[in-house]
């Protein structure tokens, strides 16, 4: 078997792309070769965009969605139902639900799922801030939109018990296999999942 050898700078670039989620060696090579074909001005604009995003994008102080301001556009939108909160694990899940165009409330991004195997406990997630947010506001319903997995179920049950004294807690219905990621679910399935949510109280 002949091993492919790259010049050191190219090998380094490919190595960086391979660190991206979902990017294998072949895709990393394709991306690196594409980058090398671009004019220097394009590469400079790209690198500046990366640095700007890394420096200026942070978390919304209210829901922990990604934003470049104190509050994200969704939280600031007065047309959204502020009394209806959908809890998601990551911003990518929020974006998936927004693509479905079914949910008209606001969100709370907890930043992951409870996973003892990975040493991720409730204290490492934005669960306490969620409880504080709900306890200090008039919330009609909390919708848990967490991945259908052991970790997702554990997190949903944990949050459900904490929030039950304050408001109605539901979980979206799933028409997908255990372990499926929300970001890969089509818009129609997500819309139906929201409509068919079940009560956890």
Swiss-Prot record:
Residues 83-177 form the Toprim domain. Signal peptide: none annotated. CDD domains: TOPRIM_recR. Keywords: DNA damage, DNA recombination, DNA repair, Metal-binding, Zinc, Zinc-finger. GO terms for molecular function: DNA binding; zinc ion binding. GO terms for biological process: DNA recombination; DNA repair. InterPro entries: DNA_Rcmb_RecR (IPR000093), Rcmb_RecR (IPR023627), Rcmb_RecR_Znf (IPR015967), TOPRIM_dom (IPR006171), TOPRIM_RecR (IPR034137). Gene3D superfamilies: 3.30.60.80, 3.40.1360.10, 6.10.250.240, RecR Domain 1. Pfam families: RecR_C, RecR_HhH, RecR_ZnF, Toprim_4. A zinc finger (C4-type) spans 60-75. The keyword Nucleotidyltransferase does not apply. The keyword Transport does not apply. It comes from the Bacteria. Belongs to the RecR family. May play a role in DNA repair. It seems to be involved in an RecBC-independent recombinational process of DNA repair. It may act with RecF and RecO. NCBIfam families: recR (TIGR00615). This is Recombination protein RecR. It comes from Prochlorococcus marinus (strain MIT 9215).
């Amino acid at each position: 078997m002949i091993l492919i050898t790259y010049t050191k700078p190219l090998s380094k670039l490919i190595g960086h792309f391979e660190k991206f989620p979902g990017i294998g060696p072949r895709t990393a090579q394709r991306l690196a070769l594409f980058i090398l074909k671009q004019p220097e001005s394009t590469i400079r604009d790209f690198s500046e965009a990366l640095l700007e995003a890394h420096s200026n994008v942070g978390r919304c102080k209210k829901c922990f969605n990604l934003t470049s301001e104190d509050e994200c556009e969704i939280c600031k939108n007065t047309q959204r139902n502020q009394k209806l909160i959908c809890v998601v694990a990551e911003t990518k899940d929020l974006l998936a639900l927004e693509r479905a165009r079914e949910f008209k409330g606001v969100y709370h991004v907890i930043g992951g799922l409870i996973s003892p195997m990975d040493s991720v406990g409730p204290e490492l997630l934005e669960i306490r801030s969620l409880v504080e947010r709900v306890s200090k506001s008039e919330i009609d319903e909390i919708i848990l939109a967490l991945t259908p997995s052991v970790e997702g179920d554990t997190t949903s049950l944990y949050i459900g018990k904490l929030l039950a004294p304050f408001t109605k807690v539901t979980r979206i219905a799933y028409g997908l296999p255990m372990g499926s990621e929300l970001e890969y679910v089509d818009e129609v399935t997500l819309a139906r999942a929201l409509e068919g949510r079940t009560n956890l109280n």
